[in-house]
């Protein structure tokens, strides 16, 4: 079940909208990102969300729960594949910690902090979280966790955008490209998470090129 839940995000046709990612990138980096870069950032963020939701759904099912609860997210984040990635070292201290708390108040606080940090007044990713839970976890989410996981997606977009912007700056590029995003993913993720995100990016860009 876990393998099917972790199917390609491109095949599932679920990912952050390119326009939403573009807005975040411009506000975070003050650099222009081409369409391929925005698609790549969206796919990387979605790959992380799918993995987190799928692992949390597995935890919920093992406990016989009908919904994903905060401690299911906490256990998922504490798994080895997450803890080995630099992205999760940062996120645990910022967005993900709120989802591993025991109260809805903590989850909302994490979501609010991530929104403010990203300079985005309204988190645009709530509907994405709900669709992802249906498509990959098939387990209901509590309302506070929808908020917190939306903050998680925003944090993923923020970190990938920031790191891709740094890669662009090092090469004196004025535009963030998909290659800069791949560099960011390589820096932020490790092991299967990295491989999954890079594969999703590659598949999405091939599909985009075929549609043009």
Q: Where do the model's predicted regions map?
A:
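Histone-fold and other basic nucleic-acid-binding segments
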Residues: 1-212
């Amino acid at each position: 079940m876990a393998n099917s839940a972790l199917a390609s995000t491109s095949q599932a046709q679920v990912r952050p909208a390119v326009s939403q990612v573009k807005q975040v990138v411009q506000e975070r980096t003050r650099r222009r990102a081409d369409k391929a870069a925005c698609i790549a950032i969206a796919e990387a963020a979605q790959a992380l969300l799918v993995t987190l939701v799928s692992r949390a759904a597995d935890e919920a099912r093992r406990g016989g729960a009908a919904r994903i609860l905060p401690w299911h997210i906490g256990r998922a984040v504490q798994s080895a594949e997450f803890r080995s990635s630099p992205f999760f070292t940062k996120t645990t201290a910022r967005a993900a910690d709120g989802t591993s708390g025991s109260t809805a108040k903590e989850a909302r606080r994490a979501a609010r902090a991530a929104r403010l940090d990203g300079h985005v007044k309204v988190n645009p990713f709530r509907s994405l979280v709900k669709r992802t839970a249906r498509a990959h976890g098939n387990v209901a989410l509590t309302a506070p966790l929808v908020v917190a996981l939306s903050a998680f997606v925003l944090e993923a977009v923020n970190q990938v955008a920031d790191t891709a912007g740094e890669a662009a700056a090092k090469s004196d590029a004025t535009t963030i490209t998909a290659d800069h995003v791949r560099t960011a993913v390589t820096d932020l993720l490790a092991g299967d998470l990295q491989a999954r995100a890079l594969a999703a990016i590659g598949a999405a860009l091939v599909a985009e090129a075929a549609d043009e």
